[in-house]
Amino acid sequence: MQYTSESVETLVEQFTKLPTIGKKTARRLANYVLKMPQEEVETIANALTSVKEDVQRCSTCYVVADQDPCPICGSDKRDASTICVVEESSDLTAIEQTNEYRGVYHVLGGVISPLDGVGPDDLRVHELATRIDPSFEDTAADAAPEPNTTPDGEADAEAPPSENGGADEAESGVDEVILAVNPNVEGDTTAYYISQLLEPFDVRVTRIARGLPIGGDLEYADEATLSRALEGRGHVD
């Protein structure tokens, strides 16, 4: 017997398809929607439709945007000689909110994760190499071994060489590639793979520092975080 509205149950079911939303939370959301003014509900519905119809990916950096190229890639005020590589568009947003970075970006679309069946060909890794050197061709990618990690978490992947055998300097004018991937095994594997892939090119490959958060206490930090903080220590200004 149906004790509640079929429309409400359908909405609850749709809400449960969202990440981290369980049945109880979905039902609370559905009940909240019932109490919302009609115009607010229509605004949400229109926003959901617009996201699927109007949003696209920048053909240069692959960030989610309303235009192509995106405002960052299309701006002459950004430093195109520096590319910050991130996993997802949300990571780009986080970095932009610091107002400290003036370069451009490259969104990978994830990280290399052999356990999840995600390899380099599933990401926009080779598109990054092409941005640095337009003559780069990914002819050896299929023959390259899949990235793996050793028991201690170190990546032992070997990146496929570029067909041009290396470039004396990046033809696109890129001087530095900053790897802003998460500090975990998958992030380490991805960073290692990219660093090896870009080795033939005359570009500096760096990775964002890892260490203690501002306001954090040493006694609560784990050993790995403390080790990274010590390794990345700098001069006191």
From Swiss-Prot:
Zinc finger (C4-type) in chain: 58-73
SMART domains linked: TOPRIM (SM00493)
GO molecular function, one term: DNA binding
Highest taxon above the source species: Bacteria
Ranges of residues in domain Toprim: 81-213
UniProtKB keywords: DNA damage, DNA recombination, DNA repair, Metal-binding, Zinc, Zinc-finger
One BP annotation, GO: DNA recombination
SS bond partners: none
PROSITE patterns linked: RECR (PS01300), TOPRIM (PS50880)
Chain positions covered by the region annotation Disordered: 132-171
Family: Belongs to the RecR family.
HAMAP family in UniProt: RecR (MF_00017)
Function: May play a role in DNA repair. It seems to be involved in an RecBC-independent recombinational process of DNA repair. It may act with RecF and RecO.
Name of this chain's protein: Recombination protein RecR
Gene that this sequence comes from: recR
